[in-house]
């Protein structure tokens, strides 16, 4: 089976510090993968590189055969990353935060709202949509 995600000798530096060094691997479609490691090992950065939120300094990342540096705009609507860090605006409702994120990816309002309703229902989050994020307890 062909890999949906392929990394070839990928490296990432931050302030001349190596975060990722020469990573090469593939993940097949439908696979369940766990990324484990110590704090500051680069797990979050790896996910940010794979999801096109960060560029690697060297090497190549392919998502469904598309080069992430050359075809980022095509890849972004097809992949997402949910950070363990809270990147939501506390003064907006959960619904407004999600709508804003959709607009950043140039998704039309109707599609955003349809998906928002569907996923909120599936994840049992409907009752939180109209609440300010700062008022939602984890």
Feature-to-residue mapping (PLM):
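Short coil-to-beta microelement around the adenine-binding A-loop and adjacent beta1/P-loop entry
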Residues: 17-18, 73
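The feature captures the beta-strand-to-loop junction immediately N-terminal to the Walker
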Residues: 36-38
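Helix-to-loop junction immediately C-terminal to a conserved catalytic motif
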Residues: 51
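Conserved ABC transporter NBD signature motif
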Residues: 59-67, 75
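Conserved ABC ATPase "signature" region
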Residues: 99, 103, 110-128
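Conserved ABC ATPase signature
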Residues: 132-138
